[in-house]
Amino acid sequence: MADNSFSDGVPSDSLEAAKNASNTEKLTDQVMQNPQVLAALQERLDNVSHTPSSYIETLPKAVKRRINALKQLQVKCAHIEAKFYEEVHDLERKYAALYQPLFDKRREFITGDVEPTDAESEWHSETEEEDKLAGDMKNKAVIAEKEAAAAEEPAPRGIPEFWFTIFRNVDMLSELVQEYDEPILKHLQDIKVKFSDPGQPMSFVLEFHFEPDDYFTNPVLTKTYKMKSEPDKADPFSFEGPEIVDCDGCTIDWKKGKNVTVKTIKKKQKHKGRGTVRTITKQVPNDSFFNFFSPLRASGDGESLDEDSEFTLASDFEIGHFFRERIVPRAVLYFTGEAIEDDDNFEEGEEGEEEELEGDEEAEDDDDAEINPKKEPSQPSECKQQ
């Protein structure tokens, strides 16, 4: 049988490799002669070579020196901005004192300690007149029946389950609430925001006021959020205003057998030698809204947090900010759902604008393709602080 592994003393594998290399070279030459391919490569090279950092590197030393001076000015601007936000915090403290009498009256109406007058109860919505005209005849037909039913049933005191209803209405909060939390939250009578005193480090405290209940003895549960309003020395250009940097919860004095933040499990253990089995019980953490008062700490031991812990802490900061900025000032609108509808409409508007912008970008790309056909489309007995 003839041996085909050599041809004129040259191994056939080498001949095949040389042939493939020659074909590859020819194909490369053909591709590089394509104007569209060359244009695409040139565009990519241009994008790489014209980044801001590469441009700065090409500037003369005297220009770089002036840019450094501008950066120093920018740092000074950041410090002035920080001072601005400190004064805003002082204004918030001042106006919080003006709001508080209104919030105190709100609590009295909610708890039923005070009944609003007819003048205080008068309210006309935008559609109330139309609804009144359309429903007059129907209301007259059933008014006697309603009055009779009302006479039989005692009127509830205040506005039952006011704050608990807000928790249910707001997704950010309802996600934290477990079924066994609900009976406790029905005893929540008020939520207050207290700002740090003048001259003290910037912070605010959320106070959750409860009526006496069967679950814990604290009349008030607190959560303190510590804030910072100063540029980071290592990265001063990242400053965008005050930020929450840490938080403290409080110790809840649970009554015996009522702690919903832990659960008791039973576990069987078998003795290796004797083979006997015993049952032990131990407590393990349990999902609950009331874990909100035992937060992770962002500082203290000097160790960095893992990714999951950082996410948990960031979510906690967002919830605290939401209580302060939205829930407490506009509680009745979250109770009725009107504020939630406003929030949803605002989010939908943002998405619509984003879609329009994307459409404009696509249109610009199409125009470029027509001009250059070679271009390839491209957030009191108070409980003890921890």
From Swiss-Prot:
Chain intervals with Acidic residues compositional bias: 339-370
Subcellular localization, as worded in the UniProt entry: Nucleus; Cytoplasm
Residues recorded as bearing N-acetylalanine in the entry: A2
SUPFAM superfamilies tied to this protein: NAP-like
Residue positions, PTM Phosphoserine: S5, S7, S12, S49, S53, S54, S125, S304
GO biological process: nucleosome assembly
Pfam family, one: NAP
Short motif Nuclear localization signal, span: 265-271
Residues recorded as bearing N6-acetyllysine in the entry: K105, K146
InterPro entries, per the entry: NAP-like_sf, NAP_family
Main subcellular location of this protein, as a coarse class: nucleus
Source taxon at top rank: Eukaryota
UniProt entry tagged with the keyword Lipid metabolism: no
Post-translational modification: Polyglutamylated and polyglycylated. These 2 modifications occur exclusively on glutamate residues and result in either polyglutamate or polyglycine chains on the gamma-carboxyl group. Both modifications can coexist on the same protein on adjacent residues, and lowering polyglycylation levels increases polyglutamylation, and reciprocally. Polyglutamylated by TTLL4.
Biased composition (Polar residues): 20-29
Subunit structure: Interacts with core (H2A, H2B, H3, H4) and linker (H1) histones.
Family that this chain belongs to: Belongs to the nucleosome assembly protein (NAP) family.
Functional summary from the UniProt entry: Acts as a histone chaperone in nucleosome assembly.
Protein name: Nucleosome assembly protein 1-like 4
Organism expressing this protein natively: Bos taurus (Bovine)
Annotated gene: NAP1L4
